[in-house]
Amino acid sequence: MRGKFICLDGTEGSGKSSQIQAICSFLQQHGKTVITTREPGGTQIGEAIRELVLSPHYQPQALTELLLILAARHEHLQTVILPHLAAGTWVISDRFNDATYAYQGYGRGIDLKIIKTLEQIIQASFQPDLACILCLPEHIAAERVHNRAHDHDRIELENRAFFARVAQGYHARAQLPHARFIDASGDQNSVFQQIRHHLELLL
């Protein structure tokens, strides 16, 4: 039986990493074989692209950034996601295509039609079985990012106007059939209970 592809997406500070761990534990308790991955990244080539895209030492043009991320996605999809799904493994990804529309589309201002055209080339009709889009008020997200212990990457250093546009993009994407809006402003357990409801429908 084919595995399921689940994505967690949302603005910086939305708590995706903690929820991915909770999702994996839940699915494993229900007898599922699970792997986790991330975008950009997930492959050797993808991780190299991730370093380029997130490094504060580079300032790529918006379209360059988009094409790099999509190149990483093609490699990721063909060599990791699709083979594991075919083998019956459930794949949990930290970000996928909703992030591209939110960050490069709404955030950078790239025409959404361009993104859609490129998406169809790379993904054809492939979409996640479930995309949980974690949304929270901008001031809470900014505080969480500020309190992170590690050095901030290039995206985390963007201004508040950029993140407001990204949040707008995520709210729009959360209305699509494959996506579910998740209120990420509460504690980890309350957020997971929302996600759990949608997971149970996939089992």
Swiss-Prot record:
CDD domains: TMPK. Its EC number is 2.7.4.9. InterPro entries: P-loop_NTPase, Thymidylate_kin-like_dom, Thymidylate_kinase. GO terms for molecular function: ATP binding; dTMP kinase activity. ATP binds at residues 10-17. It catalyses: dTMP + ATP = dTDP + ADP. One of its GO terms (cellular component) is cytosol. Keywords: ATP-binding, Kinase, Nucleotide biosynthesis, Nucleotide-binding, Transferase. It comes from the Bacteria. Signal peptide: none annotated. GO terms for biological process: dTDP biosynthetic process; dTTP biosynthetic process; dUDP biosynthetic process. Pfam families: Thymidylate_kin. Belongs to the thymidylate kinase family. Phosphorylation of dTMP to form dTDP in both de novo and salvage pathways of dTTP synthesis. PANTHER family: THYMIDYLATE KINASE, UMP-CMP KINASE 2, MITOCHONDRIAL. This is Thymidylate kinase.
